[in-house]
């Protein structure tokens, strides 16, 4: 009976664990795992194919080859189960025990484990406090180490060469002991008293003053504490016993032709055994020291390469000169155990085929080829056949299916009814890459896909393939049906917009049907209802675009009753729109359809329908839109021809003008007014503008056509040109593409990204000449090459993002925090890039939102803001709202629903169990891949935004300058801006900010503070191609360090022969002048240096590298005059190529090179004494303390003497360093910086991602903190720990009435954050597997299986979605059972005590009793 139960025991034991612990195995442990010692290197007998006894495949040790059969064949069958054969020693049992039984090798000499030796930092080195170099010399028998100095002056752990040893041995004899090899190291490790050492280190840490020492001690202390806590003995890092992997995991497979394919591990084990046996023999024979020593070294090397081949020295190679694959390689990397087998399992019940379009399907259906369905649903069919009595056995059922009996098809129909299948298209970049559909059986061999889900799958029908998976269990079917059915996933999780938006021909059909034409057939007719309109249209009385009057039935929703009420209204509309009104869902007014339906409009329509009419109505509506679109596109019969590409008449003039302008620039260049770089920039600018003008002229011409009205007068109407309609509707093509067809191709980029200054003036209709064609090929090829490279990059970014966020799940409803982030509309360059409504939609209000006019509470804190609410907020002109954000959520080890807000893929508050981390990672990673794949569509045509050179007001209002704005008035009365962060605001009558414009240094202001202006007024102008250096004082120029040949060079232009002075790069100067900085001082009439007002400092104006000096020594200058110009670099085209690495850089939190410097404190700036190469900047804070900063001289300082700066303000020009922002300005500022920067990259490509996804990633980057002061908590100062863990520990400490630890935030890049997670399983499966496992083993780490990844790896349900509920229920049950058990024990104890007491009462009457009542 027990044996029968053994069959089932496997299943029960794997579900019931809550954590996995990793540690070092002691020799005793290894022996206890083993079923016997492997003594011989033989594998199997090559004649009989039976394993050799005591060899690497020995059946006695590892178990039988065949189920229930011993090796010699004496015992066969189940009845002998458990017998051990007396002849061959094999236990009669299942052959699969060969997958789990381990052996061992007793090593003749101890060997060090290479991971703990070589994995940096070397753990052995840290425990022994020796260098890796020294330990290696000892281990590989190059030196002796003193293990016991005895009474001699030698020190413990001292290293000696052989000659030293011989000399010392002469001197001291046996008074000391020194060893070579792992024995010596083992003795040292055994002698360590960890508790004492740790105590001493703690003392040292307290007393030590030097930074370096503190760092060193803390590191060693950490390792020692790890050993202390885990109870692992350090000498276990040296192995005396080597475990042998079960043979089925390193198989030997016979190939045809008598050869064998073997796993590399067998070779590696063979070497170890051979060397070990040879060493044993040598030791028995008492061979000379030098020989055994060599053999020991070889044994150490053999064990090294078995564990991690190639880690030290040359890798061991097999017969074919290929390095052997060691145990370490089996688990790491893309093909290793983790990523290949545990996270990348293959699935049965699946198939794949080419996809074709299925326009007749409903949204929740897919067409499944009959043969495929038959194969996939085989077990279900067998079951049905047996139930119906058509087959008695499975074998008979199989036969029926194989010959495809007609009854089988009926059963198949029955089986697949309401059994959803999952379709997946690789690459699965976001959760919409796998969706469930109900299968419809079809003939043929291709899967039919619904056209509307193509956008979500990013599928097209040019040969794409898709995979089908069958959910088997009832639970799986239910989840597929409720959570994954395509009709339940109609919104993108990344931005909450509909994913089932019609595209291409559907859009074209709907657009064509909803356009209106002047004087079309039957114009002005009146109809009583829509059916009459349809009749008239079918009888060719009217056209689709005819303008008519018709009565239309609508069903608006009654607010009070919630019912739909029928109303009939007269509308002036077109025939097509009236016909379309038939499919409008109840609750939407006709006015939403009464316009030309472009792609954006249709998207809005579906979104509106979803919000107002619910999911079901929307799905039906989308399907009907699809049908109508296809039908109407077919009826429209739109086609394009060469004559549709109208080349604009103005093209010749525009190009002629541009050419003359270019000539003018060339002349200016040859007369030396502009430099070569400026000339190039200006030429590119002129041609860019010319291209745009041609494009504009072409679109203007395409857009309209002449028509005659009914009364015979001429007028124009929007064009019915086929190409224009396709682009305008959003069906296919864009203005940029039409521009290349009919305008001019424009500027092209070279492969390196720089723009070729001669444009292609021809277009595709006119045709390109050979040179133009050749220039074009650059762009086309670059596109293809980029795609391949960038897809890989984007995939890697997604992988890192998923890894850092995979354990973030919504685990509770509300964490109760009142923190949040203040949201404002995002305004840049005076334009509202993202309105406030879009930023707060779907968030939860953190404070009450108050009506600014009545001061009444509009929405209470904790309200989820929906579309109507944000409309209202915007209407009232509220310009700042504080909302909850994942960044400030107080939930430990997860998030709460209130801080996250709306689940964008569902449109409601997020559910507990939603894996918001993974959704965020996918939302950011998915467009990355899309964009990278999309670069080459414009054909490399340089799309470069024309550089802005002025700024205008967009609205009426009052001008306000910000506090940071500073300007001077020059001799001509112009106001020149001299601050670098100045901004001009326009405010409305209520004083609310309407727009804000950054004004660059050196710009000329046209308006004054407080001026009332109209929209369109210019505010400021500047030269976009150079940055000026301006004087704020009047005086005579006196150059300092401006020496030709050393700090400046005279550039003589080849063409013009004119010269200018250019400051040269310090790197190109001689050593003497490297550190000096060319600058200007000003002298007054008396010849004294002009001082900065109110200080003793002389005015000094430094020149940056590359500056062109425009003044001469001794020249008189006035306020606001330009002293030098710095040309901006020639523009390169930016697409997401610049973008993807930028996103990666932000998420990796890399400090940019040449980062700008932020003020550490609030205070007043002064310049101190300059040192060589650096200038000294002092900030005196409010308490009068001075803070010094040294700044290299080539940097641009943004502040001046006497200026007051705020903490965190830029003082030295350059890109911001996220670490500085976090340190000086806090979490919110950092999050805003990262969110805005990432959004900039995506916005440039027109991709919408909700801010909260980026915030979720930032939360994960900030999840670790550094201990500043440990208090009474169990930490070391400077240690980095998980925030949630530290807060838990602090709670514990506070509860005991002790001092909690204080900490500061740490910003980690996503790779670092992934590797530093608490879960070693997750970290090991990500990157640097060996390092992670080594560290975890020493610390005896316990993985609580909190994240998704760890659970996937150990094969449990993930703790998200339905799995979260499952695990919670299981834990509750466990704790309930534990309580029950405790209660039972308690009652038993009480009963026992009562019994004992009764006994005691009996016994106490007898005087000499010594019974203990226990």
Swiss-Prot record:
What gene is this protein translated from?
rpoC
Q: What keywords appear on the UniProt entry?
A: DNA-directed RNA polymerase, Magnesium, Metal-binding, Nucleotidyltransferase, Transcription, Transferase, Zinc
**Which GO BP terms apply?**
DNA-templated transcription
Q: Which InterPro entries match?
A: DNA-dir_RpoC_beta_prime (IPR045867), DNA-dir_RpoC_beta_prime_bact (IPR012754), RNA_pol_asu (IPR000722), RNA_pol_N (IPR006592), RNA_pol_Rpb1_1 (IPR007080), RNA_pol_Rpb1_3 (IPR007066), RNA_pol_Rpb1_3_sf (IPR042102), RNA_pol_Rpb1_4 (IPR007083)
Which portions of the sequence form the region Disordered? 1395-1414
Which metal ions or organic cofactors does this protein require, according to UniProt?
A: Mg(2+); Zn(2+)
What is this protein called in UniProt?
Answer: DNA-directed RNA polymerase subunit beta'
- GO CC terms in record: DNA-directed RNA polymerase complex
Taxonomic source organism: Janthinobacterium sp. (strain Marseille)
């Amino acid at each position: 009976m027990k044996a029968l139960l053994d069959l089932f025991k496997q299943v029960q034991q794997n579900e019931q664990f809550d954590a996995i612990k990793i540690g070092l195995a002691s020799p005793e442990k290894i022996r206890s795992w083993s079923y016997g010692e492997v003594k011989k290197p033989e594998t199997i007998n090559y004649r009989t194919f039976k394993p050799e006894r005591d060899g690497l495949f020995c059946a006695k040790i590892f178990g039988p080859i065949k189920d229930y059969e011993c090796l010699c064949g004496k015992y066969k069958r189940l009845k002998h189960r458990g017998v051990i054969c007396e002849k061959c020693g094999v236990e009669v049992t299942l052959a699969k025990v060969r997958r789990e039984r381990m052996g061992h090798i007793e090593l003749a000499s101890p060997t060090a484990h290479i991971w703990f030796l070589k994995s940096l930092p070397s753990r052995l080195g840290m425990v022994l406090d020796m260098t890796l170099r020294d330990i290696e010399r000892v281990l590989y028998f190059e030196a002796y180490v003193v293990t016991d100095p005895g009474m001699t002056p030698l020190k413990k752990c001292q290293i000696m060469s052989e000659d030293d040893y011989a000399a010392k041995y002469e001197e001291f004899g046996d008074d000391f002991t020194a060893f070579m090899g792992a024995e010596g190291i083992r003795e040292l490790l055994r002698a360590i008293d960890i508790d004492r050492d740790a105590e001493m280190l703690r003392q040292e840490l307290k007393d030590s003053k030097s930074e370096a020492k503190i760092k060193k001690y803390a590191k060693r202390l950490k390792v020692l504490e790890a050993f202390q806590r885990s109870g692992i003995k350090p000498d276990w890092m040296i192995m005396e016993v080597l475990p042998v992997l079960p043979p089925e995991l390193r198989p030997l497979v016979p190939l045809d032709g008598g050869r064998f394919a073997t796993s590399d591990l067998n070779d590696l084990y063979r070497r170890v055994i051979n060397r070990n046996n040879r060493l044993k023999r040598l030791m028995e024979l008492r061979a000379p020291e030098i020989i055994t020593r060599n053999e020991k070294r070889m044994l150490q090397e053999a064990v090294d390469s078995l564990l991690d081949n190639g880690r030290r020295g040359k890798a061991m190679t097999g017969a074919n000169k290929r390095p052997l694959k060691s145990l370490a390689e089996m688990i790491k990397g893309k093909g290793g155990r983790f990523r290949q087998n545990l996270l990348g399992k293959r699935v049965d019940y699946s198939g794949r085929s080419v996809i074709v379009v299925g326009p007749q399907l409903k949204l929740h259906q897919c067409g499944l080829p009959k043969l495929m369905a038959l194969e996939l649903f085989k077990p279900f069919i067998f079951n049905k056949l047996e139930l119906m009595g058509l087959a008695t056995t499975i074998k008979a059922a199989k036969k029926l299916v194989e010959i495809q009996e007609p009854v089988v098809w009926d059963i198949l129909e029955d089986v697949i009814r309401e059994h959803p299948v999952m379709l997946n298209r690789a690459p699965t970049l976001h959760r919409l890459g796998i969706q469930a559909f109900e299968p419809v059986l079809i003939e043929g061999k291709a899967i039919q896909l619904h056209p509307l889900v193509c956008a979500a799958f990013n599928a097209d029908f040019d040969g794409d393939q898709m995979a089908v998976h069958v959910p088997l269990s009832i639970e799986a079917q239910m989840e597929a049906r409720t959570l994954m059915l395509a009709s339940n996933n109609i919104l993108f999780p990344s931005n909450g917009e509909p994913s089932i938006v019609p595209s291409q021909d559907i859009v074209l059909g709907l657009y064509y049907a909803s356009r209106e034409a002047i004087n079309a057939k039957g114009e002005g007719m009146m109809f009583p209802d829509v059916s009459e309109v349809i009749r008239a249209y079918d009888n060719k009385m009217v056209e689709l675009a005819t303008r008519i009057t018709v009565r239309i039935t609508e069903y608006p929703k009654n607010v009070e009753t919630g019912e739909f009420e029928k109303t009939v209204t007269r509308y002036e509309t077109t025939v097509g729109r009236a016909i379309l009104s038939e499919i409008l869902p109840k609750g939407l007014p006709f006015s939403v359809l009464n316009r030309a339906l472009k792609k954006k409009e249709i998207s809005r329509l579906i979104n509106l329908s979803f919000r107002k009419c619910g999911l079901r109505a929307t799905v039906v509506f989308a399907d009907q839109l699809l049908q109508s679109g296809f039908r109407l596109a077919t009826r429209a019969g739109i086609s394009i021809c060469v004559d549709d590409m109208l080349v604009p008449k103005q093209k010749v003039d525009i190009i002629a003008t541009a050419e003359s302008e270019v000539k003018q620039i060339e002349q200016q260049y040859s007369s030396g007014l502009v430099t070569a770089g400026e000339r190039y920039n200006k030429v590119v600018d002129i041609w860019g503008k010319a291209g745009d003008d041609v494009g504009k002229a072409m679109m203007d011409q395409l857009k309209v056509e002449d028509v005659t009205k009914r009364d015979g007068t001429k007028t124009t109407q929007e064009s019915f040109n086929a190409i224009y309609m396709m682009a305008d509707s959003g069906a296919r093509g864009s203005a940029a593409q039409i521009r290349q067809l009919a305008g001019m191709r424009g500027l092209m980029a070279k492969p390196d990204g720089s723009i070729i200054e001669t444009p292609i003036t021809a277009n595709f209709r006119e045709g390109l000449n050979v040179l133009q064609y050749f220039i074009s090929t650059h762009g086309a090829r670059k596109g293809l090459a980029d795609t391949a490279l960038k897809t890989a990059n984007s995939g890697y970014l997604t992988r890192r993002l998923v890894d850092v966020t995979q354990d973030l799940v919504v685990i509770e409803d509300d964490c109760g925090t009142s923190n949040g982030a203040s949201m404002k509309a995002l305004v840049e360059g005076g334009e509202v890039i993202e309105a406030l409504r879009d930023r707060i939609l779907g968030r939860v209000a953190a404070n009450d939102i108050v009506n600014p006019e009545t001061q009444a509470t509009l929405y209470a804190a904790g309200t989820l803001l929906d579309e109507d609410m944000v409309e209202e907020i915007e209407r009232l002109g509220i310009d700042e709202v504080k909302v909850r954000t994942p960044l400030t959520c107080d939930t430990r080890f997860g998030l709460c629903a209130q801080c996250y807000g709306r689940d964008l893929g569902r449109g409601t508050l997020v559910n507990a169990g939603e894996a918001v981390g993974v959704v965020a990672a996918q939302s950011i990673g998915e467009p990355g891949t899309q964009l990278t794949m999309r670069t080459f569509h414009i054909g490399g045509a340089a799309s470069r935004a024309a550089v802005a050179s002025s700024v205008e007001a967009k609205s009426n209002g009052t001008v306000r300058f910000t506090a940071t704005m500073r300007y001077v008035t020059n001799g001509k009365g112009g106001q020149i801006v001299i601050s670098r962060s100045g901004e001009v605001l326009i405010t409305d009558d209520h004083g609310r900010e309407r727009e804000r414009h950054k004004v660059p240094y050196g710009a000329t202001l046209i308006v004054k503070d407080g001026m009332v202006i109209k929209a369109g007024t210019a505010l400021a102008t500047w030269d976009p191609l150079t940055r000026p250096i301006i004087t704020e004082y009047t005086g005579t120029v006196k150059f300092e360090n401006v020496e030709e040949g050393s700090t400046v060079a005279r550039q003589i232009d080849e063409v013009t022969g004119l010269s200018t002075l250019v400051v040269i790069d310090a790197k190109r100067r001689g050593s003497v002048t490297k550190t000096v900085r060319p600058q200007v001082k000003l002298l007054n009439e008396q010849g004294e240096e002009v001082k900065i007002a109110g200080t003793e400092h002389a005015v000094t104006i430094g020149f940056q590298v590359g500056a062109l000096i425009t003044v001469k020594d001794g020249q008189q200058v006035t306020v606001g005059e330009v002293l030098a110009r710095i040309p901006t670099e020639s523009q390169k085209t930016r697409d997401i190529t610049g973008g993807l690495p930028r996103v990666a850089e932000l998420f990796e939190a890399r400090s940019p090179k040449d980062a700008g410097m932020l003020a550490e404190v609030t205070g007043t700036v002064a310049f101190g004494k300059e040192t060589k190469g650096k200038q000294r900047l002092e900030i005196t804070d409010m308490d009068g303390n001075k803070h010094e900063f040294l700044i290299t001289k080539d940097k641009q300082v943004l502040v001046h003497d006497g200026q007051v700066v705020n903490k965190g303000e830029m003082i030295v020009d350059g890109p911001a360093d996220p670490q500085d922002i976090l340190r000086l300005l806090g979490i919110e500022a950092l999050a805003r910086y990262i969110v805005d920067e990432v959004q900039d990259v995506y916005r440039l490509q027109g991709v919408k991602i909700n801010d909260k996804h980026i915030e979720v990633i930032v939360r994960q980057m900030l999840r670790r903190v550094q201990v500043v002061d440990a208090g009474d908590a169990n930490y070391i100062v400077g240690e980095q720990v998980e925030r949630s863990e530290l807060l838990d520990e602090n709670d514990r400490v506070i509860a005991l009435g002790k001092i909690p630890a204080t900490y500061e935030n740490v910003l980690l890049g996503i790779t670092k954050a992934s590797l530093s997670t608490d879960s070693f399983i997750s970290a090991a499966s990500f990157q640097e597997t060996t390092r992670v496992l080594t560290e975890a083993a020493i610390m005896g780490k316990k993985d609580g299986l909190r994240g998704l990844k760890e659970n996937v790896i150990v094969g449990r349900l993930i703790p998200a979605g339905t799995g979260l509920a499952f695990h919670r229920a299981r834990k509750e049950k466990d704790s309930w059972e534990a309580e029950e058990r405790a209660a039972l024990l308690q009652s038993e104890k009480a009963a026992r005590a009562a019994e004992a007491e009764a006994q005691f009462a009996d016994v106490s009457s007898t005087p000499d009793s010594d019974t203990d009542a226990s």
